[in-house]
Amino acid sequence: IGHDAATIDAVKPDVVVVSTAIPETNPELMRARELDIPVWPRAKMLSELGQGYTTIAVAGTHGKTTTSSMVATMLDRMKLDPSFLIGGIVEGYDTNGRNGQGEYFVAEADESDSSFLYLDPDVVVVTNIEADHLDHYSSLEEIEETFAKFMSLVGEEGTVVVCGDNPHVAELARSTGRRVVTYGTDAANDVVCTPHAHEHALEGACTVTLPDGATHEVVIKSNPGTHNLLNATAALVVAWVLGLDAHAAAEALSGFAGVRRRFTRVGDIDGITVVDDYGHHPTEIKATLAAARGLGFKNVDVVFQPHRYSRLQALVDDFGDAFADADKLVLIDVFSAGEMPIPGVTSKMLADTVRAHHPGKSVSYVPGRMQLLEALSDIVEPGDLLITMGAGDVTTVGPEFIDYLTNKE
């Protein structure tokens, strides 16, 4: 559709809200500034929307979209009619936001540019803290300092819920002086998640032991993997912190249908299952592929599109190690997300790095889309799982590949 300064003149908005993806050169943003119209980051809008509600803000380098979606779904299935605004489409709702009539507001808190410091939360969830968005932050230490400020935003009556499997993150939370509840698979946490085998490969289950000693069975019928069981545990902890019925909350979580682009099944063709996933950071990739490895497919094949030159440059060795559980890896060109190319920072460079980390692994770099579909038709076999991964337009590859094979028959 495109953006046009004339839109601002026609609409005459009271305020313009921008996401982190909007550059200062955007014509509508420039026109708003010329007219002295207030310009708010997304998080300031979230803060305004949350006034009068009990606000649950979910943050973390990974898992915040899934966890906030789980919290919103859980509260809704408990008939509490929450409002929510999340960074992904919640399956079963076909939207990323809703204005409910209940007392709770669930907000996904974006740390990418520090704007989550505008929020005024009652409960904060932090799933993890790692090096990312190094186009904005100078170091991991600066990221941790910013998260500490974010966790401090909860008032004296508020609570910080944090994954304590990383003791440093738990220590950071406690340094704020706020009430902290830790969760994780380690028995030292306040809330313990014990994953167990489940008869359906695409499902996951765990036993959650709360601080009062009560245990609850949690079953997730989409989004496999221990990382998603931890996300579900975080949601259950939120219910417990809010004083809600934990058993009813665990039951409600079983109705979670997933988040679009988080291990979303695209389709099946010729014995091949195609899944799409938003993972674009080495830790996310590792977790998703570890979960995929346990699903019983002949091979786990991956098409990966790096997202941002700056991220690839900063984390190239971590990316090189991230694909251990992929049997076959196909790399396509970097999705710039508005960045200018960095000399030498390319998908071909990443291919060389992966080969160095995993000698003998099938790694290909394919620059063109038609060449990609042709290459995949040769690489992917019946019985394989094909995962398209990345935060860019790689999401279109799955449907295109299915169409390609359909028309080829």
Where are these regions (language model features)?
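Short acidic low-complexity segments
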Residues: 1-11, 371, 376
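Phosphate-binding loop of NTP-binding sites
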Residues: 7-11, 20-164, 168-178, 233, ...
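Short acidic/histidine-rich motifs immediately flanking catalytic phosphotransfer sites
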Residues: 10-15, 103, 381-384
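Structural beta-sheet core signal
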Residues: 84, 124, 162, 182, ...
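Adenine nucleotide phosphate-binding catalytic loops in nucleotide-utilizing enzymes
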Residues: 131, 137-144, 158-159, 174-286, ...
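Glycine-centered, small-residue-biased loops immediately flanking beta-strands
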Residues: 158, 327, 384
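Active-site beta-alpha connecting loops in nucleotide-dependent enzymes
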Residues: 259, 283, 289-358, 365-371
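A glycine-rich beta-strand to alpha-helix segment
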Residues: 371-402
